[in-house]
Structures are given as structure tokens and as C-alpha cells.
A protein has these predicted regions:
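ATP/NTP-dependent adenylation/nucleotidyl-transfer catalytic domains that generate, transfer
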Residues: 1-237
Length: 237
């Protein structure tokens, strides 16, 4: 896609040395355009790669990877994707090395140049926080209707029990970091609904789905202030 993207940067007057959101989204949309056109050419379908966690956070480019002809991962959270790959690798020796390498690679949209040593520069969780926390919130919010305070308490208790099970006698949980991740989740979940309102069809695998034609109908201009206010109260405890 290099030539097509560089031509587009020229067409819209964008300096390609400016590695901003426009630089990234041009690539994401060009990928999608090419896939759509090739699918027409061969009579196929563009299979979406986006998962449930990315849909919840709006971590996708509108009319880029947000769009496909069928979203096979639309109801599978990011943390479960890793678990599925690890489980599949255990039973398929011919793919084990490749799948485990994928699991060990930091999650990234790979839209920015790498570091000088060739390592990934753009790491998703450095930008939007922990998928473990986000998936925990999503499940208890969407499936059970719990608010921030209850989800916070549940997460702290679950994390503490997990640490003890792993041999940590007196685990210390960074509550401020948990609240920071929760704030990111609630802000992004509410402001990114417009991407879910026009998401493509997909399969529902588990008990949680964000399809506007199924389990989740929400106005794109809904306000998250009630949930953020409750989080702010937790910060002051």
C-alpha cells in the first residue's frame, strides 16, 4: 500500500513525516479499500479482524478496519483471543511456534515506523491501557449491568485472589492504575458508539455482544458523565 498511501498524502497535502492520526488512518483505510476491491474481483468476502474489545473501545479506524463484510471476531474479547490461540497451539504442532509467537508479540496496529532496533514502537496497551481490565469491565457492565463502583471492587478482589493463588502472600494492587484504566474505558466506550452503530454483521459466540442489531442499542451522542462522576468519587475514598 506504500505507493497508494504516498499518493494520497500528496493529494490531501499531508506531510508524510508528520506521524499523526491522519498518517495512520490513511494506511488503515487504504488496506480496507484494497481488500474490498480484491473481494469484488474474485467474488469473495472481506473477513473483519476486529474483536469485541476493540469495538468496545473504538480502537479501530472508521471506514478502515472498522468495516468489513463479516466480523468473525466481533463477540470475542481480546483476552480470549490469546487464550484460543494458546489452546489451539497445544493441539497443532505444525502451527505451535507461529501461534505462540503471535501471542508473545505486543498488540499493535503497526501503523507507525518501528524503533531503530526494529522493535515495535506502537503498542496498543501503552496508549489505551490494559485489555485485562477493559474486558473485565465490559463483561460485568454489559452482561450484569454493574456500575463502576461494584466493578472496581470485584476487580480488586479478583486480582488479589489471583495474586495469592500465584504465591504472593500480601499482594498490593495499584488501585490508582485500575481507576485510570476504568476512566479510559468509560470515556472511550461512550464516545466511540458511532463506530458500533454501523458495524458489519458478525457471529455471536459468547454471552456478550455489542451489535446494534442484537444485544446493544445505544445513542451515539450518549453522555458518560454519570459513570465518570462515580469513578471520581472512588478516587477520593
Amino acid at each position: 500500500i506504500k505507493d497508494a498511501c504516498e499518493q494520497h498524502y500528496k493529494d490531501i497535502g499531508h506531510d508524510k513525516s508528520n506521524l499523526d492520526v491522519t498518517f495512520e488512518n490513511v494506511q488503515a483505510r487504504e488496506r480496507t479499500q484494497i481488500l474490498m476491491d480484491i473481494s469484488n474481483k474474485i467474488g469473495g468476502l472481506v473477513v473483519g479482524t476486529g474483536d469485541l474489545s476493540e469495538l468496545a473501545l473504538g480502537w479501530c479506524t472508521y471506514n478502515g478496519d472498522q468495516m468489513s463484510m463479516y466480523g468473525v471476531n466481533a463477540s470475542i474479547p481480546k483476552t480470549l483471543v490469546r487464550g484460543i490461540l494458546e489452546s489451539y497451539a497445544q493441539h497443532h504442532n505444525e502451527l505451535r511456534e507461529t501461534l505462540l509467537d503471535i501471542c508473545d508479540t505486543p498488540v499493535s496496529p503497526e501503523l507507525l515506523p518501528p524503533n531503530e532496533d526494529g522493535t515495535i514502537k506502537q503498542k496498543t496497551e501503552d496508549k489505551i491501557g490494559s485489555y485485562v481490565i477493559h474486558d473485565f469491565i465490559l463483561y460485568y457492565m454489559q452482561r450484569h449491568g454493574f456500575g463502576p463502583r461494584k466493578i472496581f471492587d470485584l476487580y480488586i478482589n479478583a486480582k488479589t485472589m489471583h495474586e495469592k493463588k500465584m504465591g504472593v502472600e500480601n499482594p498490593v494492587i495499584d488501585k490508582a492504575d485500575v481507576l485510570k484504566n476504568m476512566e479510559i474505558f468509560y470515556n472511550r466506550f461512550w464516545t466511540q458508539q458511532f463506530k458500533r452503530s454501523c458495524m458489519p454483521d458478525g457471529v455471536k459466540v459468547g454471552s456478550v455482544s455489542l451489535s446494534p442489531r442484537g444485544d446493544w442499542r445505544m445513542a451515539s451522542d450518549a453522555c458518560q458523565s454519570i459513570w465518570i462522576d462515580e469513578l471520581n468519587e472512588l478516587k477520593n475514598i
